[in-house]
From Swiss-Prot:
Family matches, as Pfam families: HHH_5, RuvA_C, RuvA_N
Subunit structure and binding partners: Homotetramer. Forms an RuvA(8)-RuvB(12)-Holliday junction (HJ) complex. HJ DNA is sandwiched between 2 RuvA tetramers; dsDNA enters through RuvA and exits via RuvB. An RuvB hexamer assembles on each DNA strand where it exits the tetramer. Each RuvB hexamer is contacted by two RuvA subunits (via domain III) on 2 adjacent RuvB subunits; this complex drives branch migration. In the full resolvosome a probable DNA-RuvA(4)-RuvB(12)-RuvC(2) complex forms which resolves the HJ.
GO CC term (a single one): cytoplasm
The protein's name: Holliday junction branch migration complex subunit RuvA
Alphabetical GO biological process terms: DNA recombination; DNA repair
Length: 194
């Protein structure tokens, strides 16, 4: 129904933004990183939107890119995943990392997202692995393999999000055969060098 909004960014919070389009302010719920990425207050912005209609509410979900919107709409097609959980998933990991985890069948990484258990992660992979186009693989994707999932677990236990941890792991050079402690130190260096 409303596929995008183009207007002035009037206000924003952690996971929402108000976009003024010709005098009407539309509150859009967004992944946690999106309000800061779309622009500064008072600037003209454009967001791609999904209107979710419920019996008691109309909720507008906004995204900085069409790819994010597409992934969101694909996620909420999975049984048991509503728009709030879909948004939480895109808040925990960027779209590329999330698509990569689904394509590679990495249920362990998916289950680190708050609200996604092992069963839900398995259902997501089962239902979406073939639906998500291979165009996601053309970009720079973050692959977390079983060989370095222990680093992922350590970094998330230290308070980093699954997306941040996956980026740190992806930045590592050849780490095969390296002791776990060394691999963790190298991953932590990623955050020190940011």
């Amino acid at each position: 129904m409303i596929s995008s909004l183009s207007g002035i960014l009037e206000a924003s919070g952690k996971d929402w933004a108000v976009i003024n389009v010709s005098g009407v302010g539309f509150r859009t719920y967004m992944p946690a990183s999106s309000p800061a990425l779309i622009g500064e207050l008072g600037q003209r912005v454009r967001v791609f939107t999904h209107l979710h209609v419920r019996e008691d509410a109309l909720n507008l979900f906004g995204f900085g890119t069409a790819e994010e919107l597409s992934l969101f709409e694909t996620l909420i097609d999975v049984s048991g995943i509503g728009p709030k959980l879909g948004l939480a998933m895109l808040s925990a990991m960027n779209a590329e990392a999330l698509a990569s985890a689904i394509i590679s069948g990495n249920t362990e990484l998916l289950s680190t997202i708050p609200g996604v258990g092992k069963k839900t992660a398995s259902r997501i992979v089962l239902e979406l692995k073939d639906k998500i186009t291979k165009s996601w693989e053309a970009g720079v994707l973050i692959q977390v393999t079983e060989a370095n999932s222990d680093i992922l677990a350590t970094l998330t236990a230290l308070g980093y999000s699954a997306g941040e941890a996956a980026k740190a792991i992806a930045s590592l050079e050849d780490i095969t055969g390296m002791p776990l402690e060394e691999r963790i130190k190298l991953a932590l260096n990623y955050f020190n060098n940011k």
